[in-house]
A protein has these predicted regions:
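Donor-nucleotide binding loops and adjacent catalytic segments primarily
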Residues: 29, 193-269
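Short amphipathic alpha-helix
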Residues: 22-32
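A donor-sugar binding/catalytic signature common to diverse glycosyltransferases
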Residues: 113-117, 259-302
Length: 367
């Protein structure tokens, strides 16, 4: 339903833990803006404005300071446990004061509603300021914290503040696929939130018979150097990593001039790690995925099963991939095709947020 004359202000807080939280939220905001073309948007995140412009357009106010950090990482797949624990000790040393400071920021901005993917301090601040708020994500930092750091002496007190902050929201919209969330008492399950890319292979340079792969490990550097990447006859690789100048078969994905979701839909294979954005965009396009298994990551079981249900997918180790990439690709391409996914969660989340902007949403029962 359109509300063309009702200009509402939405505050969107995004975890800067890689690019996935911002990427998965963008199609929801696009769906919301179709309902509310006059929506005023503020995005609070430490992510670069240039990336946000690619996903959200330029019509928003950017607040680049946010207390949330998610987890400190050694690489795209390895958590720095000690640095993460220290980060949370500092964040919670005066959590009440931190929340009050963020609440004052919200009071000054006067948004009609807050959406968080998935900074919990922002949710606690919204509750403190009396502003309706909702969480949206496939993970939450309370259960992530307990999984990786729950044995630390300070963990019980920190986890309790995280849990209470999440539970202060009107609901936690858990996007499919998602981790189990035993800490969260207000979960509402929704469908997949993602953008379906458009296959634009005919716009890309090079001979039509050439094979094109995308190597993308998200917004956090991977410990895999592209200088070690195997050279395969007939293949060119678009990479989000640094491209070695001596390799004529590797180029930056940005040189191809396509939005990331369109590039995902245009390649022959994606090489990646388990991550909501890349997995779901691949599942919506049916593009085969070769990925580095991540058994310690709590999202992985659900994401792996979902991906295998919607496209050909094969989990490998870095050593297997670098040792015999051609054989791994042959195995991947021999798997049966699957039915591509649908992104039903975009409109489901937009409908919930639209009602939240009108303060028509009450506290939701756990699903």
């Amino acid at each position: 339903m359109l509300h063309p004359s009702a200009s509402k202000h939405l505050w969107l807080a995004l975890s800067p833990h890689g690019y996935g939280h911002a990427a998965m939220t963008a199609p929801v905001i696009q769906a919301l803006r179709r309902r509310r073309p006059e929506l005023r948007l503020t995005i609070q995140t430490a992510l670069p404005r240039s990336f946000l412009d690619e996903r959200y357009g330029s019509d928003f106010v950017h607040v680049p300071e946010i207390p949330d950090f998610g987890l400190k990482m050694l690489s795209a797949t390895n958590v720095d446990l000690d640095a993460s624990a220290e980060g949370y000790r500092r964040l919670h040393a005066d959590f009440i004061g931190l929340v009050e400071g963020e609440a004052a920021r919200l009071r000054d901005a006067r948004p009609d509603a807050v959406v968080a993917n998935v900074p919990y301090a922002t949710l606690a601040a919204a509750a403190r300021a009396g502003i309706p708020a909702v969480a949206l994500s496939s993970l939450n930092w309370a259960d992530m914290y307990r999984h990786y750091l729950g044995d630390r002496p300070e963990a019980a007190a920190i986890w309790a503040e995280m849990r209470d902050a999440y539970d202060s929201a009107r609901a936690f919209l858990r996007a499919t696929p998602a981790m189990e969330m035993p800490s969260i008492g207000n979960v509402v399950d929704i469908g997949t939130v993602a953008r379906r890319g458009r296959n634009r292979r005919d716009e890309l340079p090079g001979p039509a018979a050439a094979r094109l792969g995308l190597v993308a490990f998200g917004g956090i550097d991977h410990d895999l150097s592209m200088a070690r990447w195997p050279r395969l006859e007939g293949w060119t690789w678009a990479s989000a990593q640094d491209c070695p100048p001596e390799r004529d078969d590797i180029l930056s994905w940005r040189e191809l001039g396509l939005p990331f979701a369109d590039l995902v839909a245009s390649v022959d294979v994606i090489v990646t790690k388990p991550g909501y954005g890349t997995f779901t965009e691949a599942g919506l396009s049916g593009v085969p995925v070769l990925y580095v298994a991540r058994p310690d990551w709590p999202e992985s079981p659900a994401m792996d099963l979902w991906l295998m249900a919607h496209t050909r997918a094969l989990a490998v180790t870095v050593e297997e991939m670098l040792g015999d990439l051609e054989s791994q690709l042959r195995t991947l391409f021999s798997l049966p095709s699957q039915d591509v996914a649908q992104a039903m969660g975009n409109e489901e989340a937009a409908e919930f947020i639209d009602r939240l902007l009108l303060a028509e949403v009450g506290t939701c029962e756990s699903s």
